[in-house]
Amino acid sequence: MTRLRSAASTITNRSTPALALTASHAGSHPAVIVPIQPLLLTLERRPSCPHRVSYPEIEAYRGISSSLRSHNAIVRASDIMAQIDPRDVGTPDEWVPRHPELIRLTGRHPFNSEPPLKYASTFITPMALHYVRNHGPVPRLEWDTHTFSIDGLVKKPRTFGMNELVTTFEQETVTFPVLLVCAGNRRKEQNMIKKTIGFSWGAAGCSTAEWTGVPLHVLLTACGVDREKAQWVWFEGIEDLPHDKYGTCIRASTELDPECDVLVAWKANGELLGPDHGFPVRLIVPGHIGGRMVKWLERIHVSDHESSNHHHIMDNRVLPSHVTAETATAEGWWSKSPYAIMELNVNAVVILPNHDDLLALGEDTTFNDIETYTIKGYAYSGGGRRVIRVEVTLDDGASWQLARIIYHERPSKYGKMWCWVHYELAAPMSSLLCAREVCVRAWDSSMNLMPAFPTWNVMGMMNNPWYRVKIHHEQDTNSLRFEHPTQAGNQKGGWMTKERIMTNDVDSIKMLQVEPLDTSSAATPKPGLTADELSELPLIFADEVAKHNSKKSCWFICRDLVYDATPFLDEHPGGATSILLCGGTDCTDEFESIHSTKAWQMLKKYCIGRCSSTEDDTGTSDTSSDHEETDVALKGRTKVPIVLISREVVSHDARIFKFALPAKDLRLGLPIGNHVFLYAKINGKTAVRAYTPISSENDEDRGFVSFLIKVYFAGDNPVHPEGGLFSQYLDGLHLGQQIQIKGPLGHFTYYGDGNFSLETTNFHAYKFGFVAGGTGITPVYQVMRAILEDAKDQTKVALIYCVRSQRDLLLRKELETLQKLRPGQCRIFYTLSDMELLDRNDPIVRGWAYGKSRLNFAMVKNIIGSDAEDVCMCGPEGMIEYACKPALLKLNYDLKTQTTVF
């Protein structure tokens, strides 16, 4: 495990350094894109906000407690990096900037995400790290042209433009903080008991921001609302979804009540709303679930009856535990109004210790009562109810300790509190050593109490049992390891994937087996096909599936079976786009992370065959999307012809091959850190090899792609006397001859400013270490160039380049040019193994200022050191396995979480 020192928790009154808290990121790289310190701030009103609290019924009651006013408060969303995520390219949302640390819960599209749980430790959430719940594409709206209407039971129906709204109600505009929570927060715990019909929210589906807008009751009053007849107020957004626009409703008694503080908002944290958060205008209903707060607001309708909108009826309900998705529809459960969720329930979560944190113990493990470890977390309730108590137990509820509650806001004039609180408890080390788990529960002012165990419901909503963090005594490291119940989305980890848990469901009082999260494509297919049915299915090659990627014919692969989704496109609850993005590809991971057992059963009717890879695709992994970009050459699974236009001899056995792309204005379209496959017919058979180009995506490289390739000549190596099949073929190509290229592929992608991803998980590095051998320099050069040619990128790099002799040093001139650009940021060290064979007094040896041997521990220690967040390696297997990895282990690198092999 990788262990990072944490200053966020304390162990007090210990005279010897026997204890140290370490944060472990098992199975992932340390990811600190936003430094935690700037986030550990509390809220103060932004003095520059033009719309102050002035409405007389609310004035002076939206303030934050005076003890917090000395802090420089909100972290602006613009201070937190957001960027266009490559995963959004080819989707309707490819124009929307998003923070790379947001955890995607529903694949590429639509976008639903939550931040890592550690960011819930701050009162105000930067909007770039605010959770997002979208049902479809983000509408692309303009401030100057967007309008929304108010109609129904009002005397003066009106349509408001944004400028009119802001100026007309400037005196009534208010700003105050509100917690937003998705009703599915903590749903993954329910999915571990039994699959619900909802995707797997973790424990960070909640965020607090400072919202600016006009109270809804002011708008309704201005329109002459009929208070006697009005029973419900409907809200609709502008987006078009498969069944209906997104709409819902809330009782008029809530909307017209000044105590309830319902807002029509256009700002968050002092800035105009972002695209994912409803720009230009949305609804804020404090104390209620996020599903009632319509974004991209287009219509407000006052009515004497409840809305029949599809999303109001079919979403955000807690049905009895015995009700399944099928019986809910057959028996009419969805339309029963009492099961609709409005206000939030009481809930609490442990933030510190985080999942897989380690609490290292010294040799002396006898502790007195004043030696403590601080447990921290958040708690909230709905309806404006105050959280009055947070309790922690270390003995499974036999006794409880009161945590100190940190209130960031003060109550409104009416006694309402709309935000979360944070709590902390200094737990005695002597108790932690004997404990099996840390459990937390909260109470609110109505004496609502979190239950000990979950009650399953088909939508997995409002899950609020005690939050349980398991404690494991790790004998090999003499430390305590903390394990949270789950990790958000399709992330691995959590004790609920391994154990049984209890339920107090009166219809099913029994131990429920946790469903395994097996996403292996080799696992038994789920759709209920028998062995006989499987054997009768025709065999369909992956190349054939790849052709069916349009609305006219959309096939996909899931768990080695082929499905024709064309008839289902218009019926899909998430819209046709999310299926079309997977058209022609294997979408096993996305399907399994999102869909319920019901969806698996529905698959059966669309199954048309068994999948088999073609010869060309066997064993390859295409991580790209198959969207058609007009200015790039690479087309995902499609092979693209390229023509050799030059060959440059750069050493006795290395060549630069330059190929023309299909059009001179095309970029290759290769993300930094990715590679491509080259295909050629050799001796009547298709051969394929992976290479990384040395050309860039810059304008000067449009229209062509260049590769630096070592030619393995026949007879050079007695172990492989025939030499390299593919490299010799390339060396023998005549100008004008054609091969094929396919991609992009690869598990490592660099986005800039230290941000990178491995597979689908985002990380951040302040320093990279690189070790390259021979032509393994090409992917390293690609990443180093991206860093060092970007004046804004401050990421440090340290390279050890291992070759046999000076003539084998490829790209040396280019590397040293990069170093001259950023000398304080880049360190390069060469080492020549052939010098071990020469006399020390040889002039060649004496004149060489770098390494004179094979790679060794001293080189890695002195050049790369122990402070790189990730060490990337590319070269001969022997160099990596017997030199790189042992040296990195000795420097306490975790090979699983801190190294990447290209």
Swiss-Prot record:
GO terms for MF: FAD binding; heme binding; molybdenum ion binding; molybdopterin cofactor binding; nitrate reductase (NADPH) activity; sulfite oxidase activity
Cofactor needs: FAD; heme; Mo-molybdopterin
SMART domains assigned to the protein according to its UniProt record, in alphabetical order: Cyt-b5 (SM01117)
Domain FAD-binding FR-type, residue spans: 637-751
UniProt-listed GO biological process terms: nitrate assimilation; nitric oxide biosynthetic process; sulfur compound metabolic process
Pfam name, any one: Oxidored_molyb
Keywords (A to Z) from UniProt: Disulfide bond, FAD, Flavoprotein, Heme, Iron, Metal-binding, Molybdenum, NADP, Nitrate assimilation, Oxidoreductase
Binding site for NADP(+): 872-879
Domain (Cytochrome b5 heme-binding): residue spans on this chain: 537-612
Entry binding sites for Mo-molybdopterin: 182
Superkingdom per UniProt: Eukaryota
Entry-linked InterPro entries: Cbr1-like_FAD-bd_dom, Cyt_B5-like_heme/steroid-bd, Cyt_B5-like_heme/steroid_sf, Cyt_B5_heme-BS, FAD-bd_FR_type, Flavoprot_Pyr_Nucl_cyt_Rdtase, FNR_nucleotide-bd, Ig_E-set
EC number(s) per entry: 1.7.1.3
Protein residues bound to heme: 572, 595
Reaction catalysed by this enzyme: nitrite + NADP(+) + H2O = nitrate + NADPH + H(+)
PROSITE patterns tied to this protein: CYTOCHROME_B5_1, CYTOCHROME_B5_2, FAD_FR
Residues reported to bind FAD: 689-692, 708-713, 725-727, 778
Cofactor: record remark: Binds 1 FAD.
Binding partners and assembly: Homodimer.
Task of the protein: Nitrate reductase is a key enzyme involved in the first step of nitrate assimilation in plants, fungi and bacteria.
UniProt family annotation: Belongs to the nitrate reductase family.
Name of the molecule in the record: Nitrate reductase [NADPH]
Encoding gene per record: NIAA
